[in-house]
């Protein structure tokens, strides 16, 4: 009887161990898949190969888009023999229907997309020959949806900037129309904004994004629908901040609210991947073409 009891105990122990191991198999399998995924990321080649390319220390901001063609899907080109010239320090607004190629042009300026044919010249140099890592140090982007971190206002404004002086920070706060807002907070610049800036309004978040761009003192500004989701009061405050940001800097703007681009030096109307009209706001309104009709529909 004792031997039988002993064997039963051994058997139960072995069965329990085997059962536990079987239950662990799915977890081990998922763990191995995760390890493989992490390994693929760590071992992957860089998306951009900047080795041997020209490092740039200064940028004037003159752009030439020469016979530019690009397609995400070979069956439908997004940019179709686009030709544009943007002078250094000039503000150009890109307008048109969704899918016209506006955001693709911005991605070309940043260097995220490479042309299938044609060239993008920066200060007369083909961007394919430029070290994009050094080039992007001269760019600031203000997107439609502000990207804030859960730290303080100070942290969000100065993020990525190595040398910070209180004088420069105060100048940026004034230029971004943040002074009255920050002075009204008990903790001022050290106020915690919450996850994704959840404790702030849309206009406040956007002005902090503009201040962050100003801190970088960029040569090239990219504004992607920076005022599209704001009320009229917030839009006015942000428009003033944007005017300070874009002064004497080459600026690319994508806008659907055409009233916000009256001050642009040039407006490019895009359709089917190429520029159909090009000129100042007053010139295009006098032309009474596509831009005129688009503006009339928004009145």
What residues fall within each predicted segment?
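Membrane-water interface of transmembrane alpha-helices in multipass transporters/channels
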Residues: 1-9
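Conserved catalytic core of two-component sensor histidine kinases
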Residues: 8, 15, 136
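An intracellular "coupling" helix at the cytosolic face of ABC transporter transmembrane type-1 domains
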Residues: 27-30, 47, 69-74
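Conserved E/DxxT/N motif and adjacent residues on the DHp alpha2 helix
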Residues: 40, 47, 158
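Pre-NBD coupling/linker segments of ABC/ABC-like ATPases
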Residues: 47-58
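ABC-type nucleotide-binding domain
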Residues: 56-299
């Amino acid at each position: 009887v004792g031997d039988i009891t002993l064997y039963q105990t051994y058997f139960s122990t072995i069965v329990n161990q085997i059962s536990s191991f079987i239950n662990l198999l799915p977890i081990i399998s998922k763990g191995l898949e995760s390890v493989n995924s992490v390994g693929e990321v760590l071992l992957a080649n860089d998306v951009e190969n900047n080795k041997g390319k020209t490092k740039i220390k200064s940028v004037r901001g003159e752009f030439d888009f020469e016979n530019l063609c690009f397609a995400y899907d070979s069956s439908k080109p997004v940019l179709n023999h686009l030709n544009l010239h943007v002078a250094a320090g000039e503000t150009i607004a890109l307008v048109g229907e969704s899918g016209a190629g506006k955001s693709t042009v911005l991605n070309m300026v940043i260097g995220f997309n490479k042309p299938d044919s044609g060239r993008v010249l920066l200060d007369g140099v083909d961007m394919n020959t430029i070290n994009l890592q050094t080039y992007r140090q001269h760019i600031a982007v203000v997107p439609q949806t502000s990207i804030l971190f859960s730290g303080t206002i100070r942290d969000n404004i100065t993020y990525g900037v190595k040398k910070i002086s209180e004088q420069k920070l105060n100048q940026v706060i004034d230029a971004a129309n943040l002074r009255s807002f920050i002075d009204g907070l008990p903790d001022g610049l050290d106020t915690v904004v919450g996850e994704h800036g959840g404790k702030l309004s849309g206009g406040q978040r956007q002005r902090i994004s503009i201040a962050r761009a100003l801190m970088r003192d960029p040569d090239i500004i990219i504004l992607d629908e920076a005022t599209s989701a704001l009320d009229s009061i917030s839009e006015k405050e942000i428009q003033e901040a944007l005017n300070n940001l874009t002064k004497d800097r080459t600026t690319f703007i994508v806008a659907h609210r055409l009233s916000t681009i009256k001050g642009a030096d040039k407006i490019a109307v895009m359709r089917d991947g190429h520029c159909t009209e090009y000129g100042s706001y007053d010139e295009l309104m006098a032309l009474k073409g596509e831009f005129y009709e688009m503006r009339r529909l928004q009145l």
